[in-house]
Amino acid sequence: MKFFALFIYRPVATILLSVAITLCGILGFRMLPVAPLPQVDFPVIMVSASLPGASPETMASSVATPLERSLGRIAGVSEMTSSSSLGSTRIILQFDFDRDINGAARDVQAAINAAQSLLPSGMPSRPTYRKANPSDAPIMILTLTSDTYSQGELYDFASTQLAPTISQIDGVGDVDVGGSSLPAVRVGLNPQALFNQGVSLDDVRTAISNANVRKPQGALEDGTHRWQIQTNDELKTAAEYQPLIIHYNNGGAVRLGDVATVTDSVQDVRNAGMTNAKPAILLMIRKLPEANIIQTVDSIRAKLPELQETIPAAIDLQIAQDRSPTIRASLEEVEQTLIISVALVILVVFLFLRSGRATIIPAVAVPVSLIGTFAAMYLCGFSLNNLSLMALTIATGFVVDDAIVVLENIARHLEAGMKPLQAALQGTREVGFTVLSMSLSLVAVFLPLLLMGGLPGRLLREFAVTLSVAIGISLLVSLTLTPMMCGWMLKASKPREQKRLRGFGRMLVALQQGYGKSLKWVLNHTRLVGVVLLGTIALNIWLYISIPKTFFPEQDTGVLMGGIQADQSISFQAMRGKLQDFMKIIRDDPAVDNVTGFTGGSRVNSGMMFITLKPRGERSETAQQIIDRLRVKLAKEPGANLFLMAVQDIRVGGRQSNASYQYTLLSDDLAALREWEPKIRKKLATLPELADVNSDQQDNGAEMNLVYDRDTMARLGIDVQAANSLLNNAFGQRQISTIYQPMNQYKVVMEVDPRYTQDISALEKMFVINNEGKAIPLSYFAKWQPANAPLSVNHQGLSAASTISFNLPTGKSLSDASAAIDRAMTQLGVPSTVRGSFAGTAQVFQETMNSQVILIIAAIATVYIVLGILYESYVHPLTILSTLPSAGVGALLALELFNAPFSLIALIGIMLLIGIVKKNAIMMVDFALEAQRHGNLTPQEAIFQACLLRFRPIMMTTLAALFGALPLVLSGGDGSELRQPLGITIVGGLVMSQLLTLYTTPVVYLFFDRLRLRFSRKPKQTVTE
């Protein structure tokens, strides 16, 4: 009583306290960062190693395996995957959430150093690592195009000047440059000319290497001066290499230009990048796992004018893709939804109270509670993201509830003739415990979420804390500011109604009277109500089991990512043509704004595409509908497939795949894995629950298998090293020398001119110079035949692995796909030597599925404990919790009605309903207990009176919560796919619970009261006896 009086009778102090809360909130709001979702990225480090010309199997056994054994000893590694392809290996290390990325990077470097002695000696450089997840979509893509400069020169500008500068920007984890390679001098050898001159490929390589040497020459001193010695020991351009003498034949000089075509070109000619049908160099920028995407993008944009000045004017630097506009648009939509929710909630209060003066009170209390929450969010290190802003939107209905309960009770005393200040004190005292119970039990719902681990726990923590803080501030405001304003602003008379609102008042009275009559009938037919209540419990279980489930709603971020997978024996020239064809099909779609892509490198038969869609306001279709439309057109392209997926804000795992979800096959027997993977993939491709089924296992690449006749080689004076060196020199794009320039180093690349390698007959033109100086054709000591070989070798941990990726067809959920895959694996009878498990997002979904029911039960148990402590009763909490089954039925039915799967967002809605719907029961039970203690009423009379007296505040609080959530359901635009499941769940649950709990709660109250009396009499009878 003294606590309430302290604030009611000291209005200045109370107002200043509220102003202080508001000012702190405004300051916090201005300093809060902006993000699409809470920070949930796993710490990921990518290790890269290269050995030019090495086969995928060689890379896997000699490079990947030693590194994996060393890296696998690092503490906190939750997943390690590797992929080895032609000349390169990439190992992805995913760490536990609590592992510091910088500490992990130091351990990775130490592990690389420890494995160095086990790696092949021919590697051109040590393995390197980057603190970025290569499977994440780039946050920004920059393109360089020019009508003047070559692709190699553009790549040089990008990798030498732009990429290092961008990498230094805070938040940037990796800048991947694609579309070409560094400039180089290429030596294309003519094997017939070499044979005619008696010159071996090793002779050419040695001559070039010896002619381009950069060594210190020292200095001369003559007593008074010091002279630095400088020579022309370096060759820089193709023109300088052409006259190089590589051999003498019968006294005549054989120059490099006589036996080869020497050009200024690039290190790897098998690379291509394009943007909107124009050749381009791509800079794909990815952020650090812990970085804020908006701040990082803003920093890059601020740096662009400076970057533009460092490159020639003839080079056009453009932003091809930027993830931030859709994120900002989504957050703006949520902010608008929040404002609409506040307006609707205040309108509900006005309709019920029918007084502008009284409506001002919650109209002040709600903003103070919400704005004050921003200060706590800043102190907790949170951000303004979709989930935290949705928490505030939902909190609108909660925070007004507290003010409504206090305001309505004070208004009731005023209408009875009590003086304002006395009414404020008396009314607040009567409902103070009710408001406390409602708030604490609501916060208790989120305690299990705060203790939840893994990705779901990280994702939901900001939502739970934000909502809990808003409720806590609301509790303070409703017990301080609200009664003070009531005491000083409201008048001791019945408020005048506007004529247009009298009809609503009469309707409310009629509803209350109708409810009273129906409640009398229900209290006389309690068994029927009990059956209905049990039926709702059973229906909850059935609906939860049957409803489709997924991990997270499919987002429309306005960005698509596509992976091209062509025939494994395709040439680079044909693959470049496929890239152009696919890009034209996509570019012609009316919903597409920009398309960028590249192909080449170590995997000739694959490519990547990044597609930016037009803003949501300029297109009528969702990203998934656009993918469905494009899928039909893309299927007509022969010899290659383009798999499209919408980029999501949450992606788990480091695997680069062509679809959103993965199923990984593991085996210690590589032969068994290669035997069963095609069978499993073909079976999964027939399932209607899956789409775009593809695999990263590529073991049907064309290979030319050479078999040496070692006896013949020994007789001819040839060793295996010389033969292998011949093949590497001829076909491996061998880097044989380095050209040093002030800004970078470039390579001299040697191979047989591609004009002479159009078919396998090129091998017949190869020869080796033996130890007697004779030219011995390769066909004399080797035989060859076509064979199949893997284009990539994949590991997970230390086991051979193959990952099958898939998307979901429209109308299918991840739970449908998961169940279908499990059935298919059982039907196929896959042996125990091949193990299958979901990976990435699908794996997190499986783990979340197992914990959802436990989480809901834990929330209910927590609420029960809190209510039991508050009421000092085992029974009354059960009465209050009896409101939950009807809410669950309403929520699940609403999801079914809107064809929305049960996701993590819907789970949040269920948790919120546990806190919302019990408020009705709390108000009924509180007043019933008060009437029994002080009004000398029977339990039935007490609960009946409580239901009628609390009918208006129950309707007000329920409608306030419902209208607070309704904008989430009706909202469109960016990010609506995240908001709608939450709104659907809450609105559906509230409607159903409001219809049922007004009747079930009094019946359950009387049932437990009779049960209490029955058990309380038994001890007395025993004593009497």
Curated annotation (Swiss-Prot):
Arranged from A to Z, the UniProt key words for this protein are: Cell inner membrane, Cell membrane, Membrane, Transmembrane, Transmembrane helix, Transport
Keyword Cell inner membrane in record: yes
List the transmembrane segments.
3-23, 333-353, 360-380, 387-407, 431-451, 463-483, 528-548, 853-873, 875-895, 897-917, 953-973, 984-1004
Q: Which Pfam families match?
A: ACR_tran
PANTHER family documented for this protein: MULTIDRUG RESISTANCE PROTEIN MDTC, PTHR32063
Provide the function of this protein: The MdtABC tripartite complex confers resistance against novobiocin and deoxycholate.
The molecule here is called Multidrug resistance protein MdtC
